Amino acid sequence: MARPPVPGSVVVPNWHESAEGKEYLACILRKNRRRVFGLLERPVLLPPVSIDTASYKIFVSGKSGVGKTALVAKLAGLEVPVVHHETTGIQTTVVFWPAKLQASSRVVMFRFEFWDCGESALKKFDHMLLACMENTDAFLFLFSFTDRASFEDLPGQLARIAGEAPGVVRMVIGSKFDQYMHTDVPERDLTAFRQAWELPLLRVKSVPGRRLADGRTLDGRAGLADVAHILNGLAEQLWHQDQVAAGLLPNPPESAPE
């Protein structure tokens, strides 16, 4: 795997907040609510604009209860489950995200297909893990700030994937950051982890999203602002990896964790 790029060096970080960015975001919103896309659907820009689409498959990995389903729900603009229920089988969710490239100032529509599978199903049915890993472009490794064991489990997961799928993007996300005052994972441990693995480590809150004036409907624009750093991070890592694989960028040697 190529060494991760410097954050903000591949895509323009706050472009989604600009006037141009908001025009593109309008195609994934409807009346300030997020649009839900099926596997065969895609957003339509008005007026029609020629835009390339980059599609990626992403497997969300982590212990049961760390918030995998909640994370995907937030990324897709859906309601975050209040009570934990083990995901039965494989659940796929499509999320579109427009981003502007730093080098060319070109806008690309990123299509992320998130695969989420319950831990029990993965252990019981071997073919489910194979299906989730097949042709996967990126792995999102989740831990919970309120579950020390989920953080300590990360090195084993990362080492296993590095051996089985060495060419894929790996990112780490800490969930339930809204409960950071009660964290079981102090900042010094996060710093040591980043230094050892040299991987992107992002944080996300697991609370329900902000609402529109009716008090019931999720605010689509506010929800996008809450997860923009994750979607931009994925776009950046995956686009950079493609450029390296195509020989358009040099691939610096990867440092092994100590």
Curated annotation (Swiss-Prot):
Q: Cite the GO molecular-function annotations of the record.
A: GTP binding; GTPase activity
One of the record's GO cellular component terms: ciliary basal body
Q: Where is the region Small GTPase-like?
A: 50-258
Q: Where in the cell is it found?
A: Cytoplasm, Cytoskeleton, Cilium basal body; Cytoplasm, Cytoskeleton, Microtubule organizing center, Centrosome, Centriole
UniProtKB keywords: Cell projection, Cilium, Cilium biogenesis/degradation, Cytoplasm, Cytoskeleton, Exocytosis, GTP-binding, Nucleotide-binding, Protein transport, Transport
What are the BP-aspect GO terms?
axoneme assembly; cilium assembly; cranial skeletal system development; endocardial cushion fusion; exocytosis; limb development; protein localization; protein processing
Annotated residues that bind GTP are located at 64-65, 67-70, 82, 84, 87, 176, 178, 206
Query: CDD domains given for it?
Result: Ras_like_GTPase
Membrane-crossing segments per the record: none
Q: What does this protein do?
A: Required for efficient primary cilia initiation, regulating a late step in cilia initiation. Plays a role in the final maturation of the mother centriole and ciliary vesicle that allows extension of the ciliary axoneme.
For this entry, the protein name equals: Ciliogenesis and planar polarity effector 2
Organism (species):
Homo sapiens (Human)
